[in-house]
Amino acid sequence: MSELANKKCVPCEGNIPPFNTEEIHKYLKKVDGWEVFEDKIDGFHLIKNYKFENFLKSQEFVNKVGEIAEAEGHHPDLWFGWGYARIKIYTHAIKGLAESDFILAAKIDQISNA
């Protein structure tokens, strides 16, 4: 189990700087299969794609992610359909990544590996 999965997401109100690329790569090693993307609007963000055998399995997974997000107070962007789910995580208030993004990714990894 990732040490990050044992931590709690901390609410961010924009009072911290986003991670730099060195910090991002350090934390990226602690989560499984997540990719980092950068865009001009949202800065760096984490993305992971999942495959499932049918629509219901995708929906069940997204519902579990939603429960974790609510419990952590940190909400990813979610897309899903027949046989797939896609998750995008970043901290909106700082337009980039912070430790809480990787904590949420690690918690999601736990349910995807269960």
Language-model region placement:
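Long, contiguous binding/interaction regions
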Residues: 1-56, 60-114
